[in-house]
Amino acid sequence: MDTELLKTFLEVSRTRHFGRAAESLYLTQSAVSFRIRQLENQLGVNLFTRHRNNIRLTAAGEKLLPYAETLMSTWQAARKEVAHTSRHNEFSIGASASLWECMLNQWLGRLYQNQDAHTGLQFEARIAQRQSLVKQLHERQLDLLITTEAPKMDEFSSQLLGYFTLALYTSAPSKLKGDLNYLRLEWGPDFQQHEAGLIGADEVPILTTSSAELAQQQIAMLNGCTWLPVSWARKKGGLHTVVDSTTLSRPLYAIWLQNSDKNTLIRDLLKINVLDEVY
């Protein structure tokens, strides 16, 4: 049996809501419904009664619940033990490409410079979309996630690392937003919710990317503009803020599992400043 089906069943039984379960699992609601149907087909029974705003476990669902909890607990314990033997000196850090390029690359260098207390530790810098990294974190395939969004699941611990400033940059001075093509650099779903009000509701991105380096290199060729961290843009040089734009403050969080066996190590590593400019 696919453990992902059991995990989805447990989340729906906990939230009693397909939409909230989908949000917690970082899935679409249709994906959650499909997984539940798969599990019901495998077992040959209905697990939930479905009425609008009223999802309840059936008698079969109630019987499955303790077994599902035990199976998932055993599976997680097994994964933890196996992972511990193979990753004793490894420490994986996940983030988007833009975060690695603009700030975490420097932090990784500081971690190596301050490694006396953790000699022999092998770091893995993992680049992926946030949704994929959250899943890896939940499944103990990732030790630490650095992101611009606070965690949404109770089993995660988090620490606010500070804030960084974004500004709208282009390659030439004295440019207005209306004169430029927009390049969308992904800074998280919550950033995109406010994006239309910042660049114009009808503005369609000419390019979308998760890489700050790529976006910065394309600005001049595409007569474009994009949101970049101010401190990083100043170091790069050759970039100019768009005249009729504003600046934005973005938070940076470290997220890890509450019951991680590397809790002490994580807190020690986070004592080394992640951001060059913390405020």
From Swiss-Prot:
Gene3D superfamilies linked: Periplasmic binding protein-like II, Winged helix-like DNA-binding domain superfamily/Winged helix DNA-binding domain
One Pfam family, short name: LysR_substrate
Cited HAMAP family: HTH_type_HdfR (MF_01233)
Residue ranges of every copy of the HTH lysR-type domain listed in the record: 1-58
UniProt GO BP: negative regulation of DNA-templated transcription
Entry protein name: HTH-type transcriptional regulator HdfR
Keywords: DNA-binding, Repressor, Transcription, Transcription regulation
One GO MF term: DNA-binding transcription factor activity
DNA-binding region as annotated in the record: 18-37
Family: Belongs to the LysR transcriptional regulatory family.
Family matches, as NCBIfam families: PRK03601.1
PANTHER family (UniProt xref): HTH-TYPE TRANSCRIPTIONAL REGULATOR HDFR, TRANSCRIPTIONAL REGULATOR
Task performed by this protein: Negatively regulates the transcription of the flagellar master operon flhDC by binding to the upstream region of the operon.
